[in-house]
Amino acid sequence: ENFSATLSGLKINTPYYIRAYVYGNSRYTYSETFTSTIEITDINEQLKNYVAPEYEDNYASIASWSNRTQWNLANVHDPSVVLAEDGYYYMYQTDASYGNAHTGHGHFHARRSKDLVNWEYLGGTMPKLPDWVMPKLNEIRKAMGLETSAAAESDFGYWAPNVQKVKNGLYRMYYSIVVPGYLDGGTGATAWSERAFIGMMENSNPANNSDWVDKGYVVTNASDKGLNFNIPSTQYDNCYYKWNAIDPSYIITPENTHWLIYGSWHSGIVAMELNVETGMPKQDLGVPWAEGSAPAEYGQLIATRDINNRWQASEGPEIIYNAETGYYYLFVAYDALDIPYNTRVCRSKSITG
């Protein structure tokens, strides 16, 4: 008798050898073997046969604040995960949400899980813009000969936290805060964009989500162009900043040295050694600009796509150490945040490349 079967999940341009069998009267009977290949090489040909789903391919139905107990992994961007002493994994993230559901509910929202699959939403860890941000911003602006900024708190960006366990009873979160606007207060036609800051919070027990204590300023964007910031914000190949204080990653080496790895676009990824006890820069930071090269205390270059490119698509560094191989592995997001976005990895025996 004739019969039919459907095979799913097959790869294109891959030969498959197929054979059917039946079992009866205590024995197997096999068919002849035949081959089949799905030969589709052209994207247009694939699209001809594509059938779009009949459902909305998003989580809009549960994205609102009132549905936060259902979120699980909805409304998560740039996650950082740490295993705590209580056996839970704690996750922290960029302030980005469908329909801006997070707005008005704090920053750097947290979740926890026992299995890395099912996540309980815990809420924001930072209730408002830290008190140090505006004074530090205007201290730098004054030194640059600029007017005092009165940027609205609602316009700041809260991006890419990184959380690590330092030891039992001590966890550190490094986070990015992006200042809105342009250095001259204009529209970007005559000056480069404002800066970003990396700050740090500590907690003795991440289960107490409201107990994160802000420890203040860590580092900001650094320039090798002195005070020559009157560069249109569209001149990416001549951008004012050398290093961009976004996307921090924190690592403790086997030798117990502590490092902050950071960077986004601009000239690449840099490493800054930290004070073991405080988690702050090991060297005192001077003004975040110099002529010809960025101030050395703001970090050293450890990864770049092109040493001569001031605006390169790499960001989101994450660094780990593998004791079995003796290598540090640096993961970075590559290319623009759309179709070509991908992750690359490089390795080195040294934390500084």
Outline where the language-model segments fall:
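Short, surface-exposed linear motifs at loops/turns and structural transition points
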Residues: 1-41
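Carbohydrate-active catalytic/glycan-binding domains of CAZyme proteins
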Residues: 39-353
